[in-house]
Amino acid sequence: MIRRLLLTLGLLVAPLLPLRSQDTLATYANVLSHSETFLLTSPTSGEWTVDQSILVTNPKGRSAAALIIYTDSFRRLTSFSGEITPIGGGKVVKLKQKDLVYYSLSEGLADDSARWAYLPDGPCPLLVHYTYKVTYRNGIASFPSFLAVMDEKVRVTKASYTVDVPEGFAIKHLSGGMDYSSESKDGRERHSWTLKDFGGYAEEESMPSVFELVPYVYASPVSIDYGGYSGTQSDWKEIGCWLAQLQEGRQELDPQQVAQLQEMCRDCTTDLERLQVLYRYLRNTTRYVSLQFGIGGLQPMAATEVFRMGFGDCKGLSNYLRAMLAAVGVASDYTIIHNRRANLLPGYASLEQMNHVMLAVPLPEVGDTAWVECTNPLYPLGYRHSGAAGHQVVLVHNEGGEQIRIPGYPDSLSREVQHTQVSLSPDGSAHLTLRRELFLDHVEPYLDFRNLKPDVRRSILTRGMKLQADELTVTGVTDNFDAYAAEGRGFVPEMTIDYTMSTRLYANRNGDRMFVPLNPVAQMLSSQKGKRINDLVFKGSSVYEDHITLPIPEGWHVESLPKGEKLETAWGQFSSTASAENGVIEIRQVIRLLPGRTPAAEYDGYRAFARAVNKCYAATLVLKKDGE
């Protein structure tokens, strides 16, 4: 809970699901007490006071006592004290503000965004106590969000959060896993949330969002008076109106740059062609830098500043491309989104739900809207990447915000296919010629593949394989990333990687027999051996296909082949076949993983499925020498 990220756009909001305290966990730390109070002294100012004590019992729990405080022109750290007490005996360390490490987050910019940090050291067990106050000024868009813990295997004995406002001052709030009460007294209204004996959570592969498991509180004033910009945030339309104010005058470009952009697009005949030219220009002339700059991290850098500096964050780069498009007559919409959470909370509009900005560019000539990721121009135009496809977003118009959902893709389009041609020698060594075909979201880890060093390429291509490659050479990389103009809304990115591998240990020869692995280039399914604590969650469907061709070495014949296998389960479908004809062995294995959520108590079923699939991947065929 101490590693509170106070960035207004940087927090996930938890889904409204029951919280489960995992009381049986062996924990690394215990939050003995944690209290936070936000005292609103005026519509534009307040004081946030935090007091917390954490017992660290295991070095793995040290991060639970790490301190991070963000400040900027709206928030100032006005007091701090701390104490580190070794439980086994030793010197008590007293902390003052000068002991915190200070990081400027806006070097060279007209802003004072910064981070104060401290990580306690010393042998465990260790008792850590912090008390500090942050003063808010010039406006409040939201109150500090409360998250009980941010690290696994951390218990909470007791915690509380209070928002103290003048009576009649309207706020809105959302919470999970905490008890709420309110009290009006002496002209003040106190909104309070309390928590006792939270058992912590454990991190596991394919688990639910941690924000389902952690108690939380989100609260905001209904009216905003922030940095001189006033508005309301009862719904997304009102929030859009307020954000539009922050963008006024930020799209202006110098006349010389406008003339340059118009010259660059002189021969373009469609809006898509203009977008392609300027997207390429954005890629070649700017870089992404994470900033919390301008009106508490909510206002984009001016387009002229991004042009001058050559960098920007998601807000600044999106605003810059929007300005460049406007200069050549192309309309676009500034779009706020959470790139790790697809659904917004119904009936609760708040800036905390968003952590990213994109650009929506309507393109009637291809019957589509291009959702442009300005922080990573390696994404092909027209592709709705996995952090956007199917997500609810808000378009920011002058007349207000418009909540819509970015179209997703059919699950059937998400595929990875590998073709492997094996040239097997009688001594068990082999030379492999491979082709990896990637479709839709499977291309994302490979967007920058051409620019990677050979050892990094090798690591990516062999990840999850049992086969140990002595040599690996990439012989070709192709893609269809420029096909959006021809395919429009039906565009699906594809990439093909051709490569070769050599290995001395493909098959195991034992006398007159060779034991040949059926599919040593497969990526095995993972499953944990111990008891499952969290539900198992697969968010989408994917298909993985392996096609292996193995000519039988001269002087050898097939003695046995694994029998075919077909599995149908709630977690996926799998098939495996192996056949020999005209001196060639053909192996085909296909797995389709299905989306869904499985209770932890039923994890044994998934484990059995994963082991059955891996057994098929690891099966062997037997070749025997002729005449023996």
Residue ranges of model-derived segments:
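Bacterial Sec-dependent N-terminal signal peptides
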Residues: 1-24
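A sensor for short, sequence-defined functional sites
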Residues: 22-628
